[in-house]
């Protein structure tokens, strides 16, 4: 699962300017936590998906959030809003864990130096994070073992790798085994399945040409493949939204709904737009 290109961005055209600023304030908050807790290099691994998780946990636990303003390399001439709390710090920690294992996987697959260099820069922090979050770290390691087995066996089970991804992300979404743990785990599971399926859907042509593992391959040549794939993706997205609506979240709910109902489809829209452009040529 490529943690650098996940799907939980906002749909900016459907979001109020105030909420869009808050969303990017949380994104910058996670980025600042990465810098302070894990060093400058870790910032290149930041994803929108951990930002979603940070906002989700903030809304659920109604945590006090510190408002700051910073200059940075991305905003060198004007200070920008930065929102931080314990959940942006947790999101940053999870980002480092996920990115580290993903980079190692990239290195094993392609033997390119950049992933190994980045992973080496994160290694010391990962050791500390594994001690701090043993359940989450174990879930990621177990997931990668299961995914490797799927690839080696060239499994034709459409649901196997997606379910493994969901199981892993479900553990990341759960902070502790409290009254909300079951619902949070289910949201994470549905999001994980959606993300894995969407990534695989995007890569189907590339994987077919290169002979890489892709669970969509057995049905990709069928006449109704695109419709069937969209229906499956819609089912996963609907389950994530259904579980989310069980949570008593008031603050930031418009941002979170924007992501769940619209934002997670931005990658799908890009895929379809590229396909349309290709057909025109």
Protein language model features and the residues they cover:
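Active-site alpha-helical segments that house and flank conserved acidic catalytic motifs
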Residues: 45-66, 72-115, 183-206
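A mid-sequence, solvent-exposed acidic-amphipathic segment
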Residues: 154-198
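Acidic, carboxylate-rich catalytic segments that either coordinate divalent cations
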Residues: 262-281
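Divalent-cation-assisted or electrostatically stabilized phosphate/pyrophosphate-binding catalytic cores
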Residues: 34, 77-94, 119, 123-164, ...
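N-terminal ordered "arm"
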Residues: 14-64
């Amino acid at each position: 699962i490529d943690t650098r290109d996940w799907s939980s961005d906002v749909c900016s055209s459907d979001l109020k300017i105030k909420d869009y600023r808050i969303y990017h304030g949380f994104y910058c908050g996670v980025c600042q936590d990465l810098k302070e807790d894990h060093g400058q290099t870790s910032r290149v691994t930041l994803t929108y998906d951990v930002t979603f998780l940070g906002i989700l946990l903030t809304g659920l636990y109604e945590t006090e959030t510190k408002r700051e303003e910073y200059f940075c390399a991305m905003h060198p001439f004007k200070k920008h809003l930065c929102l931080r709390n314990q959940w942006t710090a947790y999101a940053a920690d999870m980002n480092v864990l996920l990115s580290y294992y993903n980079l190692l996987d990239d290195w094993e697959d392609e033997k390119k130096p950049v992933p190994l260099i980045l992973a080496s820069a994160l290694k010391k922090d990962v050791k500390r994070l594994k001690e701090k979050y043993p359940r989450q770290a174990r879930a990621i390691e177990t997931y990668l073992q299961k995914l490797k087995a799927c690839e080696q066996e060239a499994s034709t089970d459409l649901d196997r790798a997606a379910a493994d991804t969901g199981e892993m992300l479900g553990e990341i979404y759960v902070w502790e085994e409290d009254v909300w743990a079951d619902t949070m785990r289910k949201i994470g599971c549905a999001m994980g399945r959606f993300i894995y399926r969407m990534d695989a859907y995007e890569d189907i042509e590339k994987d077919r040409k290169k002979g890489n593992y892709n669970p969509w391959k057995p049905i990709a040549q069928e006449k109704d493949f695109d419709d069937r794939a969209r229906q499956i993706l819609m089912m996963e997205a609907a389950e994530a939204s259904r579980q989310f609506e069980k949570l008593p979240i008031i603050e930031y709910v418009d941002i979170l709904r924007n992501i769940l109902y619209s934002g997670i489809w931005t990658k799908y829209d890009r895929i379809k737009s590229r396909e349309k452009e290709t057909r025109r040529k």
